[in-house]
Amino acid sequence: MFCSGKRGLKESSVRRAKFEATSFFLAMQDQGCQCIEDISESAVIHYLRTGTSNNGRTKLPGLSLFMRDCIPQNPYEYRRIYGLIPIKYVARKTIQFLTVEESIAFQTALEDLSNTLSLKQRAIGTLLFYTGMRSCDVANLQLESIDLQNGILQFTQIKTGVAVRIPLLPVVGNAIYDYCTMERPSSDSPFLFLGEFAPHHPITSKAIPWVVSKIMDLAGIRTNKGDRRGTHLFRHRVATVMAENNVPAPVISATLGQKNPKSLDSYLSADITHLRECSLSIKEYAIREEVFDIV
């Protein structure tokens, strides 16, 4: 009944929705409801007033998702119950993103052949910087994912199961080629990135953040306590750069492997170029000098 496969949801999201739906129907039974037609507005309100699930999270997102997917089973009743569930907006923290200066410094570190980066580290950093791939997908890349002749990079995302096929930029292809021809161990493994020591197992996603931190140290960026250094910074950067260059949202979504266009909202919040176009000038309004005085 639950159409999670069509949404590309993580298994954890599916489990949460099912758990919260089960809790909801059990609570309805405790209130005397024997079938879906018996569920009243007052019963739903009473349930929601209990606050949170056992894991401390709001019940609304998972429950709403379940009810929405069940509508085809009983359109009238499930739409009725779905309409009784209020929309819950969750406040999100401001997302750190790479500034133009930080991006230039990171790029310079990647291109500086005199620093201590290995060819593998350089290839990993280049992939992240120019494609916005997740760390798990970088670690899971296989040799067959790279089509140097036709300039294509293709893989299936681990998180969503979405197949991604994007152009392989020359700078990315060159970094991968250098690693494969001059540093990659001789191995029958289908995976692209391997460990340096025998038996040369594929790297794991846990190795990627360490590579990013090393490059940032060499670039001299994000050295303050609390500065974010995760690979998600690069997904944010790729989406923002594409938006600033007027790339259509569907193309950005396809590049990042996003099924839901709304997933771009948090990335595009840093598209300063287009945000400025929406701003209103206040030059027509007289402002006293005292307003700008700093005491």
Give residue ranges: language-model regions.
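C-terminal secondary-structure termini that scaffold catalytic or DNA-interacting sites
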Residues: 282-295
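Catalytic-site neighborhood detector that most strongly recognizes the C-terminal catalytic loop/helix
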Residues: 157, 256-281
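Basic, Lys/Arg- and aromatic-enriched nucleic-acid-binding interface segment
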Residues: 107-135
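Long, amphipathic, Lys/Arg-enriched alpha-helical "connector/arm" segment
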Residues: 90-117
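Short, polar N-cap/turn motifs at the start of nucleic acid-interacting alpha helices
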Residues: 145-148, 217, 247-267, 291-294
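N-terminal core-binding DNA-recognition domain of tyrosine recombinases/integrases
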Residues: 1-94, 111-112
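C-terminal catalytic core of Y-nucleophile DNA break-rejoin enzymes
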Residues: 160-177, 190-213
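Short, basic (Lys/Arg/His-rich) helix/loop patches that form interaction surfaces
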Residues: 112-115, 210-254
